[in-house]
Amino acid sequence: YENQSTYAVTVTSTDGSGSTFAQSFSVSINDVNEAPTNITLSAAAIDENDSGAVVGTLGSSDEDAGDTVTYALSGSHGLYFEVVNGQLKLKNNTSANFEDNATLSVTVTATDSGGLATNQTFSINITDVNDAPTAIQISTNSLVSGLVAGTVGTLTATDEDSGESFTYTVSDDRFEVVDGQLKLKSGNTVEYDTETTITLTVTTTDAAGESFDQEFTLKVGSIQISSTTFAENSAGTVVGDLSITDPDFTANIS
C-alpha cells in the first residue's frame, strides 16, 4: 500500500469464434497497520556522575505514514533511564558510575498507534571522569613529647579512580609529607608542656588536580622517667621507669 495504493488491470475475454471483449478494472489495496522497525539511537555514551544526562535521540522506521510511536524501557538498567521528548536520558537524581558499571544495558520498545511493537537493546558506554579523593587516613595520630623531627605516621588517600597518585600538603609549617609519610621537619620539636594536641589540615591532590582536605588532631604524649641519675661505670644499671601521662597515647616507644 505504501508503494502503490491502486493498480489498473485490463481483462480480455475471448469466445470460441475468436471474438474478444476487454474491460479495465481498478484494484485498490487496503492499508494494514505494520509494526515499527529499526529503532535508532543517535548516541550511546555519557560521562559518569552526570545526573539527568541525555544519551541521544530515539528514532524508528514505520511504513505507515504519519503513525505515532511511543517508547518504553526495560532491561538490566532500564530503571535508570526515561524518554523525554523523544530523547533517551538518565533520570534526574540518577547518575552512572564508571567504577561500578562501565556499560549499561537498556531495551527500548517502540509501539505504534495501532498497538504493534518492536524492541531493540542498546549498550550505553559510561565514560570515566576523574573523581576527587574522598578521604585521608593516617596510620597513627600520636607523637612523643620532645620529638625533634621524625615520622608521625603514614598517610593514605581514598579515591574511586584506581592507580591514582597523590601529593600532600600540611597546614602546619612544622610538618611536611615525604613519600606519603607525615613528618616533623628538622629543627622543630613538640613539647607536651606547651601543647597536648596539635590540630592540622592535610590536603591531598590527585594527578588531575582534584583535592580533598581532612583535619587531624595529633596527641602529644608526655614521657616521664622516675630517676635520671646513675653511677658511672655501671653498665646495665636500671635508670628508672618510663611512663606516659596520656592513657589514649598509641605511639610506639623504643
What are these regions (language model features)?
Residues 1-37, 42-53, 58-134, 139-150, ...:
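Acidic, turn/loop-rich segments in luminal/extracellular domains of secretory-pathway
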